[in-house]
Amino acid sequence: MSEHVGTTPNDLRHKAALVTGGGSGIGAAVCRRLARAGAAVAVADFNGERAQAVRDEIAALATGPAPIALVGDVRLEADAERFAQGTLDAFARLDVLVHSAGVLRLPQGGPRLMHQITKEECDLVIDTNLKGTFLVNRAVLPAMMKQKAGHIVNLSSTSGRIGRAFDSVYCASKFGVLGLTESLAEEMKQFGVKVSAVLPDAVATPLWDQNGPIPAPDPSLDPDRVAGVIEYLLAMPRDVSLENIVILPFKTRRRKDRKPTDGSPSG
């Protein structure tokens, strides 16, 4: 049987990928997987030491071009542009963006009722999670549109589809990421650029430390499990699109956003 262009799996070898939030958690796990798959990886993070540590780690795993580390703040337009340009300068193309950078709340702030949340915390969360997504997505678009190919994967959350108590600002930011992603996906179809959102449930990453003494839910997802889904998504044939992928632990807590269909009371 003959193979048709666009219907075969997308080979990640020789592709250039920019991963924000690449210094830890899901972003670092994505960097490891993409390096093993043969992609050229730009590890972008706010923390230069973490970005360099992941770059050094994946350099030993890489089967493709040597990875690079980029340091900057996704909230700043100049840094977002520098992330994109730095990837292009190093690899002469930009095929993949995995935008994983994000915050939950102020460090060690702990969950609070909305009237207790400061403007400082609101600005931090919205500017990082939503405005940062806008700025970095916008920065990579010209290169992808010129190539008539590319794939953007934005990290939203299950908190981007159902509101949760004590997480009002975080939920608002992740709802926004989902809306931005869906709108951009419609805009980019004509240019051959895919735009997808991944919505993981609670993940065992340093982000959870921002909840202070409150323990992470049991079970929580391993970051590599989320990274594996992202790698699978990026390897899909060009004529196939997966949208708004919700990732849950198999032995998950009972979902509160779905009502039973058999007439029985919800728990």
List the predicted regions and their residue ranges:
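Canonical Rossmann dinucleotide-binding motif of NAD(H)/NADP(H)-dependent dehydrogenases/reductases
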Residues: P9-A42
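The beta1-alpha1 cofactor-binding region of Rossmann-like NAD(H)/NADP(H)-dependent oxidoreductases
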Residues: G48-E49, V71-F83, K119
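Substrate-binding pocket helix/loop in short-chain dehydrogenase/reductase
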Residues: Q108-M114, T118-D123
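Active-site helix of classical SDR
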Residues: N137, S173
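Alpha-helical segment proximal to the catalytic Tyr-Lys
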Residues: P142, E186-E187
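Residue(s) in the substrate-gating loop at a strand-loop-helix junction
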Residues: S157
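C-terminal helical subdomain
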Residues: Q190, A197-V198, P213-R255
